[in-house]
Structures are given as structure tokens and as C-alpha cells.
Amino acid sequence: MDFLRDVLQEYGVRFEESQIEKTFRYLNELLNSPHNLTALRSLDSAVHKNVAEILIPLKHENLRGSLLDVGSGNGVPGLILAIFFPELKVTLLDSKEKAVQFLEHVVRKLNLENAAVVKERAENFSREHREEYDYATARAVARLNTLVEICAPAVRIGGKLLFYKGPSFEEELKEARKALDELKVELEEVRRYTLKTGEQRCLLVLRKTDRSPEKYPRRVGIPFKRPLL
């Protein structure tokens, strides 16, 4: 736990000791899980890529309200945000059974009362829960145009979409112009940062400006197979 504590202090991330303990337990569960939900094999790399990478661009925020983590998979970023922002109600959404089993196990083990796990496709969930969330987030799920279509309908007007991307996001942003216009979303800010490992990252902060048309998201699979261009 000392390494986790030291790394977050070095990045300037504020925390309570209980959050360090829960995060350490989560990382151990992930690295030892039989479900093979991560390519990371060491605690060091997991601390940087699954914890610090998520918290650095939000270290001056006090997120509260409701957040939808689309394609939560191994719990990044949703579980980390649930641990470090206790006033945030987080929905961990994934359609894969092994991911859902792992997430439910960790939520129970850590007694995370502000996190809930849902097994469903994002296209269906966003259609059924229109404008219910203050935030939606995702990492390593899809390109930006697809993310906007499957996430924006679930976010209230004035709410934010927080997408974690690598440094070469400009091409995705150009591709996503139609999706942004159609779904009534605009880019508000790009937060660039560099991990101590030397890897460059960015958080795209987008804002929903108006109600997304009822025809979005399209039926399951279409936003991935035929993204808005």
C-alpha cells in the first residue's frame, strides 16, 4: 500500500486512508482474478495505469451526483471513481458475464454502497434511461463517434461526458463531428497529462447542450458497425 500512497502523493491526488485500502484490495482482486480482465501483471503498472491515470485529470474536481461507466470491464474508470468520490453514485455497465461477475464481487468485497453493477448493452441502457445521469465515462471502449452515440442519450442536458483517450485523439475528434452535432454534444475541454511512466494521456470533457434525438442510440451493434461519420 505504501507504493500506491506514494504514487498518488507524487501526482498531487488527495485521498483518505480508507480509499488507499480499498484501492489496494481492488488491485489485488484484479491482478489475481481468474477472469483475465487485464493485461497488466504488476502492481506498479496497475497503480499508474488503472488508478493514477484516472484520478490525475480529476484531482481538482469534487464529483457528485450520478455517473454511468459504459463498458466498465475490469472497473476502470468507474470503480476508481466510486472509491475516490463517495458522493458520486456510479453505475458500472457491461454486457459481458465475466466482467459483471468480477464487478459484483469487488463491489461486495469493498462494501461500495455508491456503486451498482448492471448487465446490459449500452445501446439498450441509454435508450431506457434517457437524461438520468450527470456524467457518463468510458475508457478503451470505442472511438469517439460511437461513444457519443451510446452515452449521450443517458446524460441530462448540461451534464458531462468524460472520455479517457491517448494523445492522438484529434483524428477521432474530426470523425466525431457529425455525432457531436446529432447528439447535441460539444467539446468543452481537453485535459492533457503525462504519467511518470512517460505515457501521455488526455481526458476529453464534453458537455451535452440539448436533448438527444429519440432515434439515438440506434439498435444494438449499429453504432459500432456503422458509426456516424
UniProtKB/Swiss-Prot annotation:
HAMAP family: 16SrRNA_methyltr_G. It is an enzyme of class 2 (transferase). It is found in: Cytoplasm. Its EC number is 2.1.1.-. One of its GO terms (cellular component) is cytosol. It comes from Thermotoga neapolitana (strain ATCC 49049 / DSM 4359 / NBRC 107923 / NS-E). This is Ribosomal RNA small subunit methyltransferase G. NCBIfam families: rsmG_gidB (TIGR00138). Specifically methylates the N7 position of a guanine in 16S rRNA. SUPFAM superfamilies: S-adenosyl-L-methionine-dependent methyltransferases (SSF53335). The keyword S-adenosyl-L-methionine applies. It holds the Pfam family GidB. Belongs to the methyltransferase superfamily. RNA methyltransferase RsmG family. InterPro entries: rRNA_ssu_MeTfrase_G, SAM-dependent_MTases_sf. Keywords: Cytoplasm, Methyltransferase, rRNA processing, S-adenosyl-L-methionine, Transferase. Its main location: cytoplasm. S-adenosyl-L-methionine binds at G71, A122, E123, R139.
